[in-house]
Amino acid sequence: HVMHLGAAMQMKPWLLAVIFDLPKPQTPFAQDNLLMTTSEDLSKNVVGIETPQEHFGVMDSFSLDEQMVMLRAVLKRTPEQKEKDFEKLMRAYLKGDAAEIANLDAQITGGMLPAPLWKKMRSKLLEERNVVMAQRSLMKANEQSTFVAVGASHLAGETGLIAAFRQAGFKLTPLNMR
């Protein structure tokens, strides 16, 4: 990744960790942007499940020391490691295997962070947010036909969105991703 030093110096360590943990993009457009623009092109109403403050504020709950641990861990990873891990995640995603994605999250991110920090990160980034995302998504889904797009890590587990929708009585059908 290439970034102007002045810009990097203005960013919080957690944001730098997120940016530098990504492999080289396959396309200039992120999946979120592709889904949003496609929906807008089809004149579909696009609504965020979280506010930007909720989305980004989660990381502000981590101390500066914790953010630096995250950044150092990410910077130790080689581009080859990032690409290999990304490919594993993509294979699990394309198979529709949410449990495997959760396992890979634990291996990859959990494997590079101290256990207490990984536990806090999982709780703050996934479990707590999943509850809110599920409540808001279910409200919409009970009102009208709804397409919900979230990061794949939000799908699996007891607090994942798949479990929440099934517990609410919805029948879920995976999309054919091939």
Regions found by a protein language model. Give the residues of each.
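C-terminal soluble interaction/assembly domains
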Residues: 119-178
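Structured, acidic catalytic/metal-binding patches in enzyme active sites
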Residues: 1-121, 125
